[in-house]
Amino acid sequence: MNSQDSTVMADLQAIRANYSLTSEQRQIVDHVDRVSREVLHPLQARMDAEDWWPDDLFKQMGELGLLGITAPEEMGGSGQNEFTQALVSEVISKWNPAVGLSHGAHDNLCLNNLLRNGSEEQVKKYVPGLCSGDLVGALGLTEPGAGSDALGSMATTARRDGDDYIINGSKIYITNGPIADVVLLYAKTDKSKGAKGISAFIIETDNPGFKVAQKLDKMGFRGSPTGELVFDECRVPASAMVGAENSGVSVVMSGLDLERAMVTSVCVGMAERALELGLEYAKIREQFGKPIASFQMVQSKLAEIYTEVETARAFSYRALAACVGLPKGAGGRGEIHKLTAAACLYAGEAFN
């Protein structure tokens, strides 16, 4: 890392300090920044070119302390809050966006939901492995042909058969799907009730009847494995149900606002890196005998980008702070719902 990079990093650390991060949070950010720059960033070019995911990467992330940020320390986690988890996501995404995306699906969509809604037995069974990286997590909600009515139009079913449920259906665009060991899955247990007849299950992917139908080829976030999952008479024990029967919507909504807010951290991290690269290029690219950074038009454009990045960061941090300690059942409506949706919209558009 050259002195120019060091100066940029110091400036960004100062910006984060102004958001009143604790000393522990600053230490975590510094650690994640270092290991992401040294370990994850060198993988990015090959991951993008070959749509490649290193087989042992989740275990390596577990060893580096990048997983289970919100999980209890006695289960191998870090015992931090959701805001700190978002800081980790932001920094990882800055240095390797594909890893940032897969990290979010694992640590937030799967692990956080399990911590929030799982039984004591389910948490003890799966969370330690998710923290160590011995297990890779995913979430299965979206289905082929589903639009904004993903819950009401859900076709995947789970029918009771004695002490088991038998699952049939498919899920599409599932981040980590091709490599997942456990999937938090939503399926209809009572088709007559529409969205109110959905239940959540934690599915082990070595179950007979489960298969990855295809790994999808994407334009962006290449390397992060995304796939179609198929369940064909997939039998799971009733103990795999997360929450009560037909309460899947409450499981979905319990994490929706946090999930939206977490997306903003991915956008902010990527936008921050894009700004850094733009600044570096403007300083070394010369026209008419001087760096283009000295031209007022270029300076103006960079100033606009900087303003958008920092506005997105402020919006992101505000939304994330509002999600910390949100009581179960308080999400999915009202001010928090509006705030996280707006933050997600702004951060995504600012990054683009």
Outline where the language-model segments fall.
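A short core secondary-structure module
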Residues: 155, 164, 168-212
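Hydrophobic, small-residue-rich alpha-helical packing segments that form membrane-like cores
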Residues: 146-150, 165
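A short, Trp-centered hydrophobic/proline-enriched beta-strand micro-motif
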Residues: 133-142
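Short glycine/proline-enriched turns and hinge-like loops at secondary-structure junctions
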Residues: 80-81, 149-152, 176-180, 194-197, ...
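Long, acidic (Asp/Glu-rich), low-complexity accessory segments flanking structured domains
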Residues: 232-251
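Glycine-rich phosphate/pyrophosphate-binding beta-alpha loops
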Residues: 97, 147, 172-178, 258-262
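Flexible, small-/acidic-enriched active-site or ligand-binding loops
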Residues: 153, 206-237
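Alpha-helical interface subdomain recognition
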Residues: 1-95, 99, 105, 117-122, ...
